[in-house]
Regions:
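Terminal targeting signals and extreme-terminal segments of soluble enzymes
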Residues: 1-156
Length: 156
């Protein structure tokens, strides 16, 4: 459902989208940004043999990284530079090479300084891991302050 957070300035939306899609770790993992809006994001990747642990299962670090990437796009989607300060993850099911993992980050709450997110990682709509995380919202604006209207900067 659209809301006022989705009303980013068009030039800012495109530049943020380009920036998010250039994420080096996302590229290294072969992941794809499916969607983002302020406070929300969805990232997807298929587990490859290079993503496995010594037992042959998908490495938990890959799932953690996908969740962290999704949360970073959700929290930075307002244009204010945000960095993760804490992430807790629980692994519910193993994953194998060939499994496609979708990491969906959703904002739980946000203040001027901190935002809290829930991240669900699924394979075929089945929950394989879940996480919660906190981001610190700096006073710096991605793309510089001039691209963001005053009312946007005051509100977000």
């Amino acid at each position: 459902m659209p809301n006022d957070r989705d009303e980013l300035p068009e030039n800012a939306r495109q530049q943020l989208d380009d920036l998010f899609r250039s994420d080096p770790l996302m590229d290294q993992l072969g992941a794809e940004l499916l969607m983002w809006s302020p406070g929300n994001a969805k990232v997807q990747a298929t587990i490859e043999v290079a993503h496995t642990n010594f037992l042959g299962g998908g490495h938990g670090g890959i799932m953690f990284s996908l969740g962290d990437i999704a949360m970073s796009f959700a929290s930075n989607g307002y244009g204010r530079q945000s960095v993760a300060t804490q992430i807790d993850i629980s692994y519910h099911r193993g994953v194998r090479p060939g499994d496609t993992i979708t990491a969906t980050a959703s904002e739980i709450s946000r203040t001027r300084r901190f935002a809290h997110h829930r991240v669900e990682l699924t394979v075929n709509d089945r929950l394989v891991a879940s996480a919660t995380g906190t981001t610190y919202r700096t006073d710096e604006w991605i793309l510089g302050p001039d691209i963001w209207p005053d009312e946007w900067r005051e509100k977000y």
